């Protein structure tokens, strides 16, 4: 179906009105409402008026048509992912200007969304590449020691015991890597958690109990300092446990055996917030890198992840979970002295 242009439709409309007016005048003449001279005068006047109307309409309609053509070109450029430049000096009716402004806003939002998607895809690709690289080391270790045990290459009882210990460590490392992958995938699923009444002492017992044997083996000192008068409060338990677990893992990984770790809990009643700090005596973080440690693809040092068995995603996961529960994580670190990570939580009021 052929669609006429705006200019053609206006011309057709004017011609149609002239023809219709002429027909009415002829009928009026036949019915003797007007004499011949008056009918001719009215017909000529109608034609002249119509021509003037058409000319005036053309003068006013041309800028509108040009703006629509420009808008059409800009739309095609946007579809073809070409950069378009909007002429702000070009005059147009209010409705067309509003349409143009709406289109520009839509294009801007779409471009932002597309850039965000591209960046996320790029980051996901980097994460997968990093994790694939991390998986090779424990898998290679498991394979080599398994083959050694199978073929009898490792036969001395002490060596066999050490081989089993290494296999267990590498299996645990794989478990940590897959656990990190699962948490990264779940971060953007919009998962919600119920508010729970949290007792700090019970929360710390649940978090620290799995580390008890590890802390003893490494001859570490773990001190917990908090006021006993801190009342129970409502918060989201699963994210908090995961955040503190990741922060504690980070403190253990990047500090030496025999060193001290402090967990300090304080309350600011004026702002209704709880602060939980985990302080280590580890290697520390240089100032220029402290603002980047929560990035998804950032690693302070690849060799350290190989040594500690981590994926480098622990702090990223912790920070993302903190944002989801309206909390925050801050870092204070001195190179070769230690690092303090502080989780600040709001105390929510339970609403039934």
UniProtKB/Swiss-Prot annotation:
Principal location class: membrane
This protein's GO CC annotations: plasma membrane
Enzymatic reactions: ATP + protein L-histidine = ADP + protein N-phospho-L-histidine
Location of this chain's protein in the cell: Cell membrane
InterPro entries in alphabetical order: 2-comp_sensor_kinase, HATPase_C_sf, His_kinase_dom, HisK_dim/P_dom, HisK_dim/P_sf, Sig_transdc_His_kin-like_C
EC category name: transferase
Function statement: Member of the two-component regulatory system SaeR/SaeS. Probably functions as a membrane-associated protein kinase that upon sensing the appropriate signal, autophosphorylates and in turn activates the cytosolic response regulator SaeR.
Name recorded for this polypeptide: Histidine protein kinase SaeS
Originating organism: Staphylococcus epidermidis (strain ATCC 35984 / DSM 28319 / BCRC 17069 / CCUG 31568 / BM 3577 / RP62A)
Taxonomic classification: Bacteria, Bacillati, Bacillota, Bacilli, Bacillales
């Amino acid at each position: 179906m052929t669609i006429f242009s705006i200019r053609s439709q206006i011309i057709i409309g004017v011609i149609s009105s002239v023809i219709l007016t002429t027909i009415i005048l002829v009928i009026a003449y036949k019915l003797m409402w007007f004499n011949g001279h008056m009918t001719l005068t009215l017909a000529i006047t109608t034609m002249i008026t119509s021509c003037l109307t058409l000319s005036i309409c053309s003068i006013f309609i041309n800028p509108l048509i040009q703006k629509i053509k420009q808008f059409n070109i800009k739309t095609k450029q946007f579809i073809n992912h070409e950069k378009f430049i909007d002429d702000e000096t070009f005059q147009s009716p209010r409705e067309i200007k509003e349409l143009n402004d709406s289109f520009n806003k839509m294009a801007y939002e779409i471009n932002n969304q597309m850039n965000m998607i591209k960046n996320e895809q790029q980051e996901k690709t980097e994460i997968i590449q990093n994790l694939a690289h991390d998986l090779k080391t424990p898998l290679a270790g498991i394979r080599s020691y398994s083959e050694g045990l199978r073929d009898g290459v490792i036969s001395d009882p002490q060596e066999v015991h050490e081989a089993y210990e290494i296999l267990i460590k590498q299996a645990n490392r794989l478990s940590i890597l897959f656990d990190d992958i699962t948490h990264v995938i779940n971060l953007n699923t919009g998962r919600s958690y119920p508010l729970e009444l949290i007792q700090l002492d019970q929360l710390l017992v649940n978090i620290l109990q799995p580390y008890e044997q590890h802390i003893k083996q490494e001859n570490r000192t773990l001190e917990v300092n908090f006021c006993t008068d801190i009342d129970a409060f409502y918060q989201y338990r699963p994210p908090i446990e995961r955040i503190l677990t990741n922060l504690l893992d980070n403190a253990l990984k990047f500090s030496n055996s025999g060193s001290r770790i402090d967990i300090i809990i304080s309350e600011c009643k004026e702002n209704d917030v709880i602060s939980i700090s985990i302080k280590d005596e580890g290697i520390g973080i240089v100032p220029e890198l402290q603002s980047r440690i929560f990035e998804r693809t950032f690693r302070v040092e690849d060799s350290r992840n190989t040594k500690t068995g981590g994926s480098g995603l622990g702090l990223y996961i912790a920070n993302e979970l903190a944002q989801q529960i309206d909390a925050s994580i801050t870092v204070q670190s001195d190179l070769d002295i230690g690092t303090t990570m502080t989780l600040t939580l709001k105390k929510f009021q339970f609403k039934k």
